[in-house]
Amino acid sequence: MEDDSLYLGGEWQFNHFSKLTSSRPDAAFAEIQRTSLPEKSPLSCETRVDLCDDLAPVARQLAPREKLPLSSRRPAAVGAGLQNMGNTCYVNASLQCLTYTPPLANYMLSREHSQTCHRHKGCMLCTMQAHITRALHNPGHVIQPSQALAAGFHRGKQEDAHEFLMFTVDAMKKACLPGHKQVDHHSKDTTLIHQIFGGYWRSQIKCLHCHGISDTFDPYLDIALDIQAAQSVQQALEQLVKPEELNGENAYHCGVCLQRAPASKTLTLHTSAKVLILVLKRFSDVTGNKIAKNVQYPECLDMQPYMSQTNTGPLVYVLYAVLVHAGWSCHNGHYFSYVKAQEGQWYKMDDAEVTASSITSVLSQQAYVLFYIQKSEWERHSESVSRGREPRALGAEDTDRRAKQGELKRDHPCLQAPELDEHLVERATQESTLDHWKFLQEQNKTKPEFNVRKVEGTLPPDVLVIHQSKYKCGMKNHHPEQQSSLLNLSSTTPTHQESMNTGTLASLRGRARRSKGKNKHSKRALLVCQ
């Protein structure tokens, strides 16, 4: 059920050689390999840091950072509950976590995208803008999510919430791209979505023979944590960045001394995301059984120890949403979430039910996905809310509301299902069906293991890599409140190619997407002179 980190765009692996070498400016990544430098080397440590920060040339900045809303437009109080349309708790739990992501919500409420969008139909950003605006501006009510949000994904059965979450994030990311123009990989990583959720890994390999160093950079949108041997999120992060020795059969082929030699490899976060999505790998690759252990996670998380540069002071993130799975395997269960409203109060969002909660209850859950935001970002948004005009606060009757699906007032305008353009659903389904999307993840997956032995590229330039589905198993209906499916939008007849893809998918899903000890494939080198 759990999937590994997403990588949108290519990776960059920078190679520094003492002699001039030809380069490919359109490479999906670049590699830096350098020998140990003398004390007065013209390429100082500071120079190398600046070089790494640039990573790769950007042909077009799709979403300049100044375009992000600087002030909060979110209501301070909690918004609406979401109606379960039949096995859609995974959709509702994911949508609530995105709705209460401050930078994303503020951008949606600014309506900036819809004013300039040229797609009009089939745009996930426009669809999410309508949903987030409606959810936040209708506190005390229950609304029905638009079918277009799950078009091409929902098939009438329980699906993986994290998988749907990243499916939605990817669709929003695609909506940021100009559909009529070719965009290079580096520019794709400048979109609004990548600015909010994205950062870069750095994998550094040091040859123990000549002391040459190779740095590889790879974009991420979420971070998957192995919790089998970890009792806390901090321990899982420590294991992730723990140095690894490469020797024997796994010895490193050094590009500096041109021989196989023992080496050390370290994976760290080179740049930090505004919003951090941590996925706890709770489900077995083979059986799908759940690792139902308690893994501690803090309200405030310092990510500085896991960064490439650890001497720049604390990098504190605060928890604002938790996605929870209740059940014993990926075959069954129920999803719900906890979110922190702008006012600072925590709420449990369980489909139509919205109830006040406490931080003690939030931190005691067997979390599946954790959402953190940089403390400075949260404080900036909170301060702007306190200075601005706030909507009415929820009364006690609203806070304690437990609206059941069978008790919905169908005549309330907020509860009416929006008019759904059939062409919108049809187009969204055609553009990205679940099976086709999963197949692309398997065929074009990238890993943070960085196989430095290969530098040739194999990914087509028009393929967008995000993440794979590990499990074929769908979650059966075990939630008593779930109705029969109303969102089965995948009944369209697949093409011959899609049928072939679906058949191939079964043999691919069981493979782990990331394994720290394995090597990375499909690289193209951008060689830079010292």
Swiss-Prot record:
Span list, region Disordered: 382-414, 509-530
SUPFAM superfamilies attached to this UniProt entry: Cysteine proteinases
Molecular function terms, GO-annotated: cysteine-type deubiquitinase activity
Class in the EC hierarchy, top level: hydrolase
InterPro entries in alphabetical order: HABP4_PAIRBP1-bd, Papain-like_cys_pep_sf, Peptidase_C19, Peptidase_C19_UCH, USP_CS, USP_dom
Enzyme Commission numbers on file: 3.4.19.12
Ranges of residues in domain USP: 80-375
Annotated catalytic residues: C89, H334
Compositional bias (Basic residues): 510-524
Locations listed in the record: Nucleus; Endoplasmic reticulum
Protein name: Ubiquitin carboxyl-terminal hydrolase 17-like protein 18
Native species: Homo sapiens
High-level lineage: Eukaryota, Metazoa, Chordata, Craniata, Vertebrata
Annotated gene: USP17L18
